């Protein structure tokens, strides 16, 4: 009798992250709870209905959390959990005793007395209410509640950047769960599981393919495959949308007519899109709509034919309008620029392209605007376009996928960053105009608007590649529903649902998360200079010089004496003037510009004093050391929880936190060395370029190795590395230690290139301190590098090593 019990315990602790925050873990014995009804009354028994799904979810969750079996029926009994739409409830039982005001997708939840009421404004609202109730139970919260919950905005979408070949652009959690080999996959099990996660946080639609779309998504076979995806997600109230390639009519798509033009005003093109859209809605009658990227980064669009972006958007809007669909039209439109032109500024592009078109978009067009004017940077001002489209519906584009922010190998909790935008006051007409109110349609009285986020889940069992990154996914849904929620509390809730009710676990993981974005900002790019990553290659590691001397417009304009973009009206690009007057005045002047955006708006000497009293360059030095120091604490804090977290998730996340600890030092050294080199200004604390405890590999005795000059230079501490003489060489490097005898931590910087798995061993005296392989591609999903650079650079540390002088 003992062995089966032990087997069950083992299974309970074998977790891989696939359940996300929907683990429904049994409550610990220390938690007591009141009576929970044993009967679930479902007011819609159609198996494709989200109401039916809600009943099944409640039955599953209550059994798992409380160990209580519930009977599901459609008959009214005393002491039941009643699940259905508000209209269905009124038809069955009459009016509620209190007035309930529900918006689209909203729900009413009451646990008062011995009957639980979960009533939605529509069917998916009912499912949202069921997930809310189960979230309470899973967190051990048995409060008596009676309240209505309504989403702040109607659009709460996710964008996947999945390609038909199964790859995912900026995906760091495995291959696509939707596509492979040019078509839709046969097994949609993971798609159903994904829909469940989406519904649990109130996401109502998903665009399943990349904004850099492939026209073959529109073959009849693929349209039928998309229908299978829609059928799979429909029971969870998740509608699907499609990204479109603007020039599709000219691509010779199998099963579709082939035209010689994609001019949006050409009658044949209009007919082509009308017919294709009709085919899609025949298969997917509830398709949410289209997402369009046009005239951006090489993509075709209406400007190709001297048509406006509004005319391009309206082409699709008219096609989906009869079916109730909407068009999300991306504002991410910009051109290559000449850096020698002091007035040139990519940040101006969105306002330049879209403000003149305000009011020309059809009512079912929503302009989808990245949160900042450039591209998902570690800090940007809120896009001024939010304040410039009074007669056009808008949605913000966020990014859960950490493209520029560590690619899920670094712990970075993003909601505090998003808050800086959603809570920003644009001061339109000198009145309070929070971005979140603009998105909800309150400021400009628009009926459409809301949120889109690039999420990019994949086949990895953790969905995003990292257990802790799932907090960003969860929090996105929660903030899209209610952007006023406290982001620390959101993380605490997520931690309870993901790792259990131990308060030490909750406090430790949440505090790490709260510190993570400031730490990443500190060791990547501060004062509004943007994320100083390699914008020309992987977007992962440091390479500040890649920002300048090209046409991409993410310039820092750093030289020997000065740094930053002058975006003032008086002397610069005029970007500050694209904001409403009060906000423009704040950003126009150095004295009123917040320090954390100083270099975004102003070109200043490195010796410019901040409000803290420090110079810009000293702040760079101090911040990078402080950020990396914080990152060193994450792995030890996580290790303190070892006996409180299952082994698999514990070890998988520990690997990433140790990687982050090493990579943050690589970031720190690269950035401070670069700016020390370019400015010639010393660090007040003599840290930069001064490493008395460091041994340079090129100064050691080399056997089978040769010296190699690294590019960019700052990704090696003395600008050089050593590499084996050939790929088949087994080599060694050695030195005699002159440090005082004692116990040390020894850190080794090395390069882990994609395409090979070198083996390493470090010995002190006759003792092997450690052995490892350059095999991070087996554990990390970040974009790899084939070069010795800031992306392939790693650092591994061995602690408590006995060292004898000599």
Protein language model annotation of sequence segments:
Residues 90, 181-184, 257-492, 498, ...:
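Catalytic-core regions of glycoside hydrolase
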Residues 31-49, 175-179, 209-212, 596, ...:
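Acidic/histidine-rich, surface-exposed loop or edge segments in extracytoplasmic proteins
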Residues 13-113, 143-144:
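Acidic, contiguous N-terminal accessory segments
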Residues 432-692, 711, 735:
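Catalytic domains of carbohydrate-active enzymes that cleave complex glycans
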Residues 685-806:
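Extracytoplasmic
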């Amino acid at each position: 009798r003992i062995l089966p019990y032990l087997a069950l315990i083992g299974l309970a602790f074998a977790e891989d992250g696939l359940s996300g925050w929907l683990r429904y873990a049994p409550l610990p014995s220390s938690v007591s709870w009141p009576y929970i009804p044993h009967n679930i009354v479902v007011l819609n028994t159609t198996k494709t209905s989200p109401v039916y799904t809600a009943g099944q979810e409640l039955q599953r969750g209550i059994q798992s959390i409380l160990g209580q079996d519930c009977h599901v029926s459609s008959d009214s009994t005393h002491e039941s959990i009643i699940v259905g739409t508000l209209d269905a409830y009124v038809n069955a039982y009459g009016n509620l005793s209190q007035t309930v005001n529900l918006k689209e997708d909203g729900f009413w939840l009451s646990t008062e007395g011995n009957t639980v009421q979960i009533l939605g404004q529509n069917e998916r609202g009912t499912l949202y209410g069921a997930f809310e109730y189960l979230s309470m139970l899973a967190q051990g919260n048995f409060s008596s509640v009676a309240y209505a919950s309504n989403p702040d905005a109607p659009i709460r979408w996710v964008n996947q950047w999945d390609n038909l070949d199964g790859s995912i652009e900026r995906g760091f959690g495995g291959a696509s769960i939707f596509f492979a080999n040019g078509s839709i996959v046969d097994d949609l099990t993971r798609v159903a599981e994904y829909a469940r996660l989406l519904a649990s946080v109130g996401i109502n639609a998903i665009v399943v393919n990349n904004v850099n779309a492939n026209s073959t998504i529109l073959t009849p076979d693929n349209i039928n495959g998309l229908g299978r995806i829609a059928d799979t997600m429909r029971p969870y109230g998740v509608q699907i949308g499609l990204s479109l390639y603007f020039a599709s009519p000219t691509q010779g798509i199998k099963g579709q007519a082939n035209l010689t033009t994609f001019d949006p005003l050409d009658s044949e093109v209009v007919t082509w899109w009308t017919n294709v859209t009709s085919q899609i809605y025949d298969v997917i009658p509830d398709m949410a709509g289209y997402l369009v990227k046009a005239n951006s980064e090489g993509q075709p669009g209406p400007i190709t034919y001297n048509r406006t972006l509004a005319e391009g958007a309206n082409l699709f809007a008219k096609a989906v309008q009869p079916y109730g669909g909407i068009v999300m039209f991306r504002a991410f439109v910009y051109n290559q620029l000449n850096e020698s032109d002091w007035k040139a500024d990519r940040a101006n592009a969105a306002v330049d392209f879209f403000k003149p078109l305000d009011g020309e978009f059809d009512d079912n067009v929503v302009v989808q605007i990245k949160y900042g004017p450039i591209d998902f940077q570690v800090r940007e001002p809120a896009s001024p376009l939010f304040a410039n489209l009074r007669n056009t519906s808008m949605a913000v584009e966020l990014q859960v996928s950490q493209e520029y922010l560590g690619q899920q190998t670094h712990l970075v909790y993003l909601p505090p960053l998003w808050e800086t935008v959603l809570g920003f006051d644009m001061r339109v007409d000198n009145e309070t105009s929070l971005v979140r109110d603009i998105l909800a349609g309150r400021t400009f009285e628009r009926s459409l608007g809301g949120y889109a986020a690039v999420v990019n889940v994949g086949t990895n069992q953790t969905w995003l590649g990292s257990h802790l990154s799932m907090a960003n996914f969860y929090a996105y849904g929660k903030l899209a529903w209610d952007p006023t929620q406290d982001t620390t509390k959101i993380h605490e809730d997520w931690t309870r649902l993901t790792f259990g009710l131990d308060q030490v676990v909750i406090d430790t993981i949440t505090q790490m998360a709260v510190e993570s974005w400031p730490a990443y900002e500190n060791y990547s790019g501060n004062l509004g200079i943007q994320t100083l990553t390699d914008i020309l290659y992987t977007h992962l590691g440091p390479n500040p010089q890649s920002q300048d001397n090209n046409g991409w417009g993410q310039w820092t304009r750093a030289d020997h004496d000065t740094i930053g973009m002058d975006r003032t009206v008086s002397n610069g690009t005029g970007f500050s003037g694209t904001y409403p007057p009060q906000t423009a005045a704040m950003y126009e002047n150095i004295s009123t510009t917040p320090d954390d955006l100083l270099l975004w708006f102003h070109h200043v000497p490195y010796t410019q004093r901040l409000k803290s009293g420090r110079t810009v360059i000293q702040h760079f030095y101090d911040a990078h050391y402080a950020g990396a120091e914080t990152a060193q604490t994450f792995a030890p804090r996580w290790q303190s929880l070892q006996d409180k977290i299952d082994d698999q998730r514990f070890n998988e996340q520990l690997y990433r936190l140790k990687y982050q600890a090493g990579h943050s030092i690589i970031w720190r050294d690269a950035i401070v060395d670069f700016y020390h080199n370019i400015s010639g200004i010393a660090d007040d604390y003599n840290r930069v370029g001064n490493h008395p405890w460091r041994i340079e590999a090129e100064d050691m005795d080399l056997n089978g190795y040769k010296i190699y000059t690294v590019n960019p230079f700052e990704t090696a501490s003395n600008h050089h590395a050593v590499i084996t003489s050939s790929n088949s060489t087994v080599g060694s490097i050695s030195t005699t230690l002159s440090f005082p005898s004692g116990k040390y931590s020894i850190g080794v910087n090395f390069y882990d290139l994609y395409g090979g798995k070198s083996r390493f061993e470090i010995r002190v005296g006759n003792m092997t301190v450690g052995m490892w392989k350059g095999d991070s591609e087996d554990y990390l999903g970040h974009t790899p590098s084939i070069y010795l650079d800031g992306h392939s650079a790693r650092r591994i540390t061995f602690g408590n090593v006995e060292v004898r002088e000599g």
